Amino acid sequence: MIQQIDAPLREDVRLLGNLLGETLKQHAGQDLFNQIEQIRALAKGARDGQAETEKKLEQLFLDLKDEEILPLTRAFSYFLNFANIAEQYHVVRSRRRSEFDEQGPPPNPLIHLFEKFKQNQISSKQLFQQVSNLSIELVLTAHPTEVSRRTLIQKYDDINEGLSKLDQQKLTPRERQQVLDDLKQLICSAWQTDEIRQNKPTPLDEAKWGFTTIEQTLWNAVPKFVRELDTLVHQHCDAHLPLDISPIRFASWMGGDRDGNPNVTHNVTQEVLWLSRWQAADLYLRDIEDLRWELSIQACSEELSQTLGRRHPEPYREYLRSTRERLKATRQWLSLRLQGLDGDDSQIIRHKQELLDPLLLCHRSLMECNLPEIANGKLLDFIYRVNCFGIELLKLDIRQESGRHRQAISAITEYLGLGNFESWTEQARQNFLIQELQSKRPLLPKYLNEPEGSLIEHPDVKEVFATMRTLAEQPPESLGAYIISMAEYASDVLAVLLLQKEAGILQPLRVVPLFETLKDLDGAAKTMETLFNMHWYKQHIQGKHEVMIGYSDSAKDAGFMSANWAQYRAQEELTAVAKSHGVQLTLFHGRGGSISRGGAPTQQALFSQPPGSISGAIRVTEQGEMIRFKFGLEGVALQNLEIYTAATLEATLLPPPVPKQEWRDLMHQMTDISVRVYRETVRENPHFVQYLRTVTPELELQMLPLGSRPAKRKVSGGIESLRAIPWVFAWTQIRLMLPAWLGTGAAINQVIDENKKAVLDEMLAEWPYFQTLIDMLEMVLSKSDANIALYYESHLTDNEDLKILGEMLRQRLNDAVQTLLSMKGESKLLSKNDVLDQAMQVRKPYLLPLHLLQAELMKRRRLYTAQSNAERTPVDHALMVSIAGIAAGLRNTG
């Protein structure tokens, strides 16, 4: 069954599995090893359809003592993590292999795409202009689905490095044995490490994790990528890219996203901003030391000589000395600030240009002296890095919920004796905000002396004001966008602009409304039209605007298909409104790893957006565990930078067709059915919330120290109070995957029954948007397993009402699978995606025991808490390991 998987990948999986086995024998005993082998054999039998083997497994787990479960869950969890490592390294290996194969397809998708542009009569001038103006920004967010500890991630990276060494042809037997010994030592060290964090990460921990990704992979991958791009452009357009090119940049929400996270305060934001600049200065200092070592050349231009003011035997080294000293001063000053101390800031670097100008002068001089090899060596890499990472490493976005801003403005209006802003009509709010934005005077005195109970003294209001004052003190280059979550009205955007003005922010952050519920997505274009019609606002934005489309909350609100179509329509309408007002629109996609959070292969996801909606500019969130999968290894990071660039260029220069009216009508019909079925189940079934809390580990997930934010917006309440990410995570753990297919299968089935299969076939053949939607549905259905979901249910509840609901949900899951197969005319899922199918087949013998163990652990934990009311129980650790292991095995968590 595993034969179709690439032999080298199979060998790596086997090697890591064997080394883990040896470690277990040595450190956990032969008995445990034998037990694991027995369980693995039974699980393989169960995978291949032998019903009696699953029964044996169940009995075996029932008989285990509490303390016997932890080593088992750890062993299976580690195997799944090692399979991921092998797969991730295999991407790098395959890429290298394809570079040797001149007959095969090129590893870089841009090579094929540039040929396609030529065939489609895209002129070299048009292509050059488009590449030069590309603006892709990837925004790293710490969504709480990265369940692996950073300590272990480092060991996993070292294991990757070991696999890479084993691939080298010229290792001597002794060298090869040394690599194997190193791998064994790493696996032994991982086994002896607790894979579960003891404490939730702080927002500062999350931010440091983002900086680590930059330092370890992107710092080298970015200049390599820009060089590749420049070579390609030169081949096809006979011109080199401008030196200030930066097609891809990075931003972050870690330490800036305060929506629903009381742990992100203005002090935390300040600390993260300083730390980010410190990290950048530190990395540039290493680079400049390297560069000064290389630039021992005597020959220099008249311009450089005059700037130095004298002749010098090593002009470049001498000239860059002051830049090095300024970087040291910057790092030292930031170090002091992080310790709460003041220091001399007269020499610090405050703007990117202060770092770039000396580098560009050196480059001009070397080119003038006919030394392009040196000019375009380490120096050019340095220039590309400064273009991409600036003085801040990652621009920090700020995100806050619209209600907090309304509350803050209400505090101001109440203080001024104007009443409560929140109770005014929308028109009255807009009038007040525009009037005050045009006024030269401040609204509030510098010092307030109000009684304690007044709104202006409310801690939440004071925190909003304090955050704005903190932003006013930063170099503008350190900051990205100010995002308003749950944006509904034009006044939501104006309110943030007024709060920025009141705090004295001289270069206001661009304000980005985030539309995320079905209702807000449907009203998004109208809201933006209202803003664009305001003379003051139109002048303020200077022809550019950014709007964020939310994926998670809309899918939780309406189901995958309805949310997906609402997002598509909102983008179409926003693109049209912006165009009619002459505004250049950038859409910011709040995607995640799972499909109900917009997760899809990048190229497919971007090409399936509405035509015209990606016009050379895009922002996308990279969330939680996806950061590690996409950027954790330099080779994989490089590939993902190429894919983003190719996808953005293709969607811009060769956009997909405008969907036919017949297709749109059918999508409307299907989404109406889909949202009705979804909400009938999720919102109207009186037993649904109880089912979620009983059968899935939704409540137990809150124990896992995942991200720095609470799993719920409010402590009590139903589905509405649950964050979108734990919502997806919980259903994924029991393999029901409900958010992704509920309602969608029923909708497709109904239109097939109405003899509209021919239209569906046409949509599938000709419309990239619909192809992606169906591919994503198929991928998630292939990871679902009704039998595993039934096992959790039968193990965890005797309630007849819940069993009836569970039966209905599993039936609907099976119906969705059958509907998809009949629509595609295929007999099994993933019949055209062998790689994913095989990856799941390999994982099944390791996932099944973890699921059965998890159900048993949940049962035991609930018994303990019912008996003693204790917060901690003897099975907590094993339960958390099972949650992390299943997340690793399925590769998309929340």
From Swiss-Prot:
One of its GO terms (cellular component) is cytosol. Keywords: Carbon dioxide fixation, Lyase, Magnesium. It is an enzyme of class 4 (lyase). The keyword Chaperone does not apply. It catalyses: oxaloacetate + phosphate = phosphoenolpyruvate + hydrogencarbonate. One of its GO terms (biological process) is tricarboxylic acid cycle. It comes from the Bacteria. Forms oxaloacetate, a four-carbon dicarboxylic acid source for the tricarboxylic acid cycle. This is Phosphoenolpyruvate carboxylase. It comes from Acinetobacter baylyi (strain ATCC 33305 / BD413 / ADP1).
